[in-house]
């Protein structure tokens, strides 16, 4: 990833993304902190889809927008598990767009059928509880210790709580459809 000074707005938040062989993949814009006039929440935006026309591969421009708390004087901004999960979800959409390689922009990135559009982002969410992934960056900001495996397991267990009950409610609400 190479930083790009595309405009003052994204001076430190625009990145030209290259494949391992050095070929240009996309422009990624990031906007991580709240400011006056910015709506709340998190989202991915595709400013320019990918497409191929007359042998020329037009690469996408995408953004990931979050509203992480800004760091304060002498203290880092720490992310909650929910914020990490949301970031991974939106980054999954961005990856879907950046890795697109199709003839028609209408089938590129998140412009796919609705039954598939969430798949890459939901796959990315799984990294939030992968010890190997977390150990690369998720450390206590004062001691440098990694997140204990027991805590990661508690998060996984909590996310699976009542799953069978919820599934049974779906079956009860529409038994013939979910048989």
Task: Describe each PLM feature range.
Residues 82-97, 121, 176:
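Active-site recognition of the HExxH zinc-binding catalytic motif
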Residues 18, 23-24, 30, 100-169, ...:
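Acidic/histidine-rich catalytic neighborhood
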Residues 1, 5-10, 174-176:
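Short, small-residue-biased leader/transition segments that mark boundaries at the very start
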Residues 55-72, 92-100, 144-152:
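Active-site-adjacent bridging/hinge elements
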Residues 8-11, 16-86:
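Active-site-adjacent "gating/activation" loops or surface patches in catalytic cores
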Residues 2, 80, 84-87, 116-120, ...:
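Hydrophobic (often cysteine-bearing) scaffold residues that line and stabilize catalytic clefts
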Residues 3-7, 97-106:
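Surface-exposed helix-capping loop/turn segments at secondary-structure junctions
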């Amino acid at each position: 990833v190479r930083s790009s000074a595309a405009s003052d707005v994204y001076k430190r938040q625009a990145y030209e993304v290259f494949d391992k062989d050095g070929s240009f993949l996309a422009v990624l814009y990031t906007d991580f902190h709240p400011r006056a006039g910015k709506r709340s929440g998190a989202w991915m935006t595709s400013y320019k889809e990918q497409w191929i026309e007359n042998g020329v591969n037009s690469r996408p421009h995408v953004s990931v927008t979050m509203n992480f708390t800004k760091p304060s004087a002498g203290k880092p901004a720490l992310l909650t598990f929910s914020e990490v999960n949301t970031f991974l979800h939106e980054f999954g959409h961005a990856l879907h767009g950046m890795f697109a390689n199709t003839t028609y922009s209408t089938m590129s990135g998140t412009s796919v059928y609705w039954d598939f559009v969430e798949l890459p982002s939901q796959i990315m969410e799984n990294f939030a509880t992968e010890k190997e992934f977390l150990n690369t960056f998720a450390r206590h900001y004062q001691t440098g210790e990694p997140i204990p495996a027991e805590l990661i397991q508690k998060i996984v267990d909590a996310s699976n709580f009542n799953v069978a009950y919820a599934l049974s409610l779906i079956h009860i609400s529409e038994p013939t459809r979910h048989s």
